[in-house]
Amino acid sequence: NPGNKKSWQLALDYIAAHSEIEEVIFSGGDPLMAKDHELAWLIKHLENIPHLQRLRIHTRLPVVIPQRITDEFCTLLAETRLQTVMVTHINHPNEIDQIFAHAMQKLNAVNVTLLNQSVLLKGVNDDAQILKILSDKLFQTGILPYYLHLLDKVQGASHFLISDIEAMQIYKTLQSLTSGYLVPKLAREIAGEPNKTLYAE
């Protein structure tokens, strides 16, 4: 919630009071909709919490607007003591172009760990060869494939649904096409569960 420092302070107070919290996740909406100075304020305050070790940022914005990865943003991540992980949301190899690759190179240069999560979508990427090309292009860009999600059964998205049996067939074929470290974990998020449910890894 960009600009809402009162809410942020409540979250900071909670994190500071719970020493078991080692990682903070910036997630959606999209955290990179916030301005660099807003992110800087929040990260500087997180740095002051001694038990925090890692910052994870989930975002799709660099795929749509690669120019969002500004020099100021990269400097902010370079200077933080927190180990920073960025998880991009890319579903098809055609989403990766040279402008996006350059933005990721800037993040690599400041030691940001880059991961990707995709959603398996009927008619978009429900083909092992497409997923292999996606993994190859991600890795060439410095991004490690992390998760391949089975689509949540939500209203209005049924035309993208793939059966679990089909998904497993696609996944097994993908495993035969590329190196193990380029095969993302096949998973589903189930409401009420604290962690993703893994179908294969």
Regions found by a protein language model. Give the residues of each.
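C-terminal accessory regions of radical SAM enzymes
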Residues: 168-201
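Iron-sulfur (Fe-S) cluster-binding segments and ferredoxin-like electron-carrier domains
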Residues: 1-2
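Conserved AdoMet/S-adenosylmethionine-binding subsite of the radical SAM
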Residues: 7-23, 32-178
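Short, internal active-site loops enriched in acidic
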Residues: 31-32, 62, 192-197
